[in-house]
Swiss-Prot record:
GO terms for molecular function: structural constituent of ribosome. The lineage of its organism: Bacteria, Bacillati, Bacillota, Bacilli, Bacillales. This is Large ribosomal subunit protein uL30. The keyword Transmembrane helix does not apply. Disulfide bonds: none annotated. One of its GO terms (cellular component) is cytosolic large ribosomal subunit. It comes from Geobacillus kaustophilus (strain HTA426). Keywords: Ribonucleoprotein, Ribosomal protein.
Amino acid sequence: MAKKLAITLTRSVIGRPEDQRVTVRTLGLRKMHQTVIHNDNPAIRGMINKVAHLVKVKEIEE
């Protein structure tokens, strides 16, 4: 089965640069401690790397 990623917003985007805010929103995260599920692909991994200090990532098998 394909791997998926559970991405949780753990830190606020208040006071962060606009590009980081846009990246968090593009991942589908709106509120603190919200978790979204995405397929594991290079585009999503790149977005995670850009805001790694704001999110927590867990790999899940489905």
